[in-house]
Amino acid sequence: MNTTVSNQTPRIRIFDTTLRDGEQSPGCSMTPQQKLVMARALDELGVDIIETGFPASSHSDREAVAMMGRELRRPTLAVLSRCLQADIETSAKALETAANPRLHVFLSTSPLHREHKLRMSREQVLESVHRHVTLARGYVDDVEFSAEDATRTEEDFLAEVTRVAIAAGATTINLPDTVGFTTPEEIRGMFSRLIASVEGADKVIFSAHCHNDLGLAVANSLAAIEGGARQVECTINGIGERAGNCALEEITMALKVRGAFYNIDSAINTPRIVSTSQLLQRLVGMPVQRNKAVVGGNAFAHESGIHQHGMLRHRGTYEIMRPEDVGWESSQMVLGRHSGRAAVEQRLRALGYLLEEEEVKLVFEQFKALCEKQRVVTDADLQALMQDATVQEGYRLASMTISDVGSRANALVELSDPEGNRVAETAQGNGPVDALFGALASATGVKLELDSYQVHSVGIGADARGEASLSVRHDGVEYEGTGTSKDIIEASALAWLDVANRLLRQRERGVVAGKTAAVA
C-alpha cells in the first residue's frame, strides 16, 4: 500500500499532555526531575507543544515548569490555568523562563457543567471567557482556550464561546471530548461546521482533545482532523484520567501509515516512539499491555504458522509498518566493565534519556560500581539506575534486616525520610515479604492493600538482578510499583517505596490538582 504524501502535505501540531493530563492518571505522579527527563525525551521525539503541568496546583509543578523553560528552547511550553485571575498570574510567572510560552485557559461550557459545577448562566460564561482570555493575552502572545465538555455543549452556544475567545485574543481553540462521549461522525461534523461558520476561525488553530472512555479517542481525533482540526492533544501510551487519552504513538502512526488517505503528517521522529514509551513506563510504574498498538510487546510478534510463513515470504503480508520505523530493535547492546562513558551515554540516549553533563557523570559512576558486582549491564539495569537517579523525593531505604521468629518472620527497616531524618520500624508477618511490607507501612504511615506481587530476573545469567513488581490499592485506587536489586527482598522493598513515595507526592500536591479539569 502506498503511504507516501506530497511535499506540500499539511502538518498537524502534536500537543503532548503526558506531563499534565497524563500525570492525573491514578498513580502516575512524577517529581520535577522526572518530568524534566520525560520532557527531554518529548523534545527529541519532536512534539510541537509540551503541556508541562498546572502551576496553580502545586509548588512541584511550578518548579518543573521553570526547569523545563530554562533548558528546552525549541518546543512550545504550555501550562494549564482555570479562568481565574490568580491562576493565570501564577501560570504566567511560572512560564517566565520559557522561550516559547503558551497559556492554556479553560472553562466548562456544557449545560450540565454550567448548572451543577459552575452555577453560571450562558452570559456569565461568555463574560468570563472574554475577561480571562484577554488577561492571558496580556502576558503572552500564544493563548489556547479550551471549552471543557465541548462535545456535550449546545452547538449554537459553543459557536458563540468560540467567537468570543477568538475576539479576546485566543490563538488556539480546543474543543475537548472531556468524558469520551462523542463518535467520529459527530465530532467531524462539529469541527467542520464551527470552522466554516465562526467569525475569525480562519485566523486560529482548532484543536481536538479526546478521551478514551468508549475506546474511541484515536478514532475521534482522526475524525476531528478530517473536520479541520490542525492540532491534536495526546499522551504517550494514552495515559490519563479514567480510561486515558488519545495515544500519541497511535495517532501519529495512523497519519503516517495512512498518509495517502489523510494527506496530513506530523513532525514526530517516529523511531524514538518505543524508547519514549518505555521511558514513561519506567518513570510512572505503569506498563502497557502486551497487545497495545505500536508499543506493546506483541505489536510485531507473529506466532501463527500461517503468519510466519507469510512474513518469511514478504513482511508486508502481515505488517503495515516496520518495527524499526517506531524504534523496535532486534538486538540488545550489552555493556560491561570495559565500556566507556561515551558508550553508556549513547545507550541511555537510545533508551530515551537525555542527560546533563553532571547527570552523565553521576550515572556513569553508578554504572562502574554495578560492573564491580556483575559482568554485564543490560538495558534493564541502566533503566533501573536511571529510576534511582531521577527519584529524588520521598523515603529511601537505608537498611533492612529479616530474621525468623519461630514460624513467623521479623523485619527491621530503617528509612531516610524526605528531610534526611532516619526512621526505623519492625513488624512480623507470615513470611519475609509480608513482614517487610508491614514494617514499611509503619515507617511511612502509608497503608497499601496488596493485590499481586511477582519477581522476575532482569539481565543475563548469573549477573541477573531481581525485579519486583507489585500491584496495590490505596483508598480504592490501584497503583503499580517496581524495584530492582541483586537481593529480591530489597527489590521488593524498593517496589513498595516506589508506590508509597508516589502516593505521598500526590498528597503533597493537594486536592487542587484533582479539580483541574478533566479539560481535557
From Swiss-Prot:
It catalyses: 3-methyl-2-oxobutanoate + acetyl-CoA + H2O = (2S)-2-isopropylmalate + CoA + H(+). InterPro entries: 2-IPM_HCS-like, 2-isopropylmalate_synth_dimer, AIPM/Hcit_synth_CS, Aldolase_TIM, LeuA/HCS_post-cat, LeuA_allosteric_dom_sf, LeuA_bact_synth, PYR_CT. SMART domains: LeuA_dimer. It is found in: Cytoplasm. Keywords: Amino-acid biosynthesis, Branched-chain amino acid biosynthesis, Cytoplasm, Leucine biosynthesis, Manganese, Metal-binding, Transferase. Its cofactor is Mn(2+). Residues 12-274 form the Pyruvate carboxyltransferase domain. GO terms for biological process: L-leucine biosynthetic process. Mn(2+) binds at D21, H209, H211, N245. GO terms for molecular function: 2-isopropylmalate synthase activity; acetyl-CoA C-acetyltransferase activity; manganese ion binding. NCBIfam families: leuA_bact, PRK00915.1-3. Belongs to the alpha-IPM synthase/homocitrate synthase family. LeuA type 1 subfamily. Catalyzes the condensation of the acetyl group of acetyl-CoA with 3-methyl-2-oxobutanoate (2-ketoisovalerate) to form 3-carboxy-3-hydroxy-4-methylpentanoate (2-isopropylmalate). This is 2-isopropylmalate synthase. It comes from Xanthomonas axonopodis pv. citri (strain 306). The lineage of its organism: Bacteria, Pseudomonadati, Pseudomonadota, Gammaproteobacteria, Lysobacterales. The gene is leuA.
